[in-house]
Design a protein with these regions (language model features):
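C-terminal transmembrane helices and immediately adjacent loops/tails
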Residues: 1-167
């Protein structure tokens, strides 16, 4: 999982920076980074718990299917949220660099196909039902939407209490 999610993470180095962040210098503060981690970590944790509950219910005690569903969901959310949190703008208003977008798409597709391959079976992954895949994709979209909707209020809150959010 970590190796695959590292590919889009490495590609972030090729990413575009929003024009607003190039025009004027900005200051980073550890407190602001900590607050970001707390807020978005809580959003992530809520969806992790939802995923665990759904997978527990949908896989009915099939440990391998649960593990595979978790593998797919955790990888999809990890690479998907990168496209959301890489910018303060709405994700669709800030185009990612081609390398970042391609790496993210390839890893997402690969994560969903891997359980049906010999390589996937080496890692204990098993094919899962369409219902499990649908649930994973719905959780993914819910998580990305929640993260996107959290950004605006978070950055407004940060701007009120910190000069780090202002140019």
């Amino acid at each position: 999982n970590n190796l695959l999610s590292d590919l889009p993470s490495l590609a972030i180095a090729t990413d575009r920076v929003d024009r607003e962040w190039i025009e004027r210098p900005h200051r980073w503060r550890v407190r602001d980074i900590r607050n970001f981690m707390i807020v978005f970590g809580l959003v992530s944790s809520v969806f992790d718990l939802l995923t665990f509950a759904l997978l527990y219910w949908l896989t009915a005690g099939d440990v391998e299917a649960f593990r595979t569903g978790w593998f797919i969901e955790s990888l999809l959310t990890e690479v998907g949220v990168l496209l959301v949190i890489r910018t303060r703008l709405r994700a669709w208003q800030s185009r990612p660099a081609p390398m970042l977008l391609v790496a993210t798409i390839l890893v997402a597709i690969g994560s969903m196909l891997l359980p049906w391959t010999a390589v996937g079976s080496w890692f204990g992954l098993v094919p899962v039902t369409a219902t499990v895949l649908l649930a994973v994709v719905l959780v993914l979209f819910g998580y990305l939407l929640a993260s996107e909707l959290t950004k605006g209020p978070f950055y407004r809150w940060l701007a009120r209490g910190s000069t780090a959010a202002r140019p």
